[in-house]
Amino acid sequence: MIRKAFVMQVNPDAHEEYQRRHNPIWPELEAVLKSHGAHNYAIYLDKARNLLFAMVEIESEERWNAVASTDVCQRWWKYMTDVMPANPDNSPVSSELQEVFYLP
């Protein structure tokens, strides 16, 4: 498994709405993530800084990257643009984090 972590932002007034939209996520999005090899996906909120920290275990970079081109992912990104900063393609603005420590 490949461990990935990344940071996103959430609008200051949208913390509760962001959480509501993820509990639960759309069943078809969950199915796409799982079918593309995503496991143990978690997102944490830093309320003081309006930051989201996400971590996920993936089976391959290629399969993970392919999620972005699915119809359900494109619809999800558009659905989330009013609660978080987005790129021109509606993907969330994010920064990948470098792993510096891991305790198995």
Swiss-Prot record:
Main location as per UniProt = cytoplasm
Q: Which UniProt keyword terms apply here?
A: Carbohydrate metabolism, Cytoplasm, Isomerase, Rhamnose metabolism
> What does altering residue 18 to F do?
Loss of mutarotase activity
Q: Which residues does the Swiss-Prot or TrEMBL record annotate as the active site? A: 22
Name which cysteines form disulfide bonds.
Answer: none
For this protein, what is any one GO molecular function term? protein homodimerization activity
Its family remark reads:
Belongs to the rhamnose mutarotase family.
Q: What is the protein's name according to its record?
A: L-rhamnose mutarotase
UniProt lists the gene as rhaM
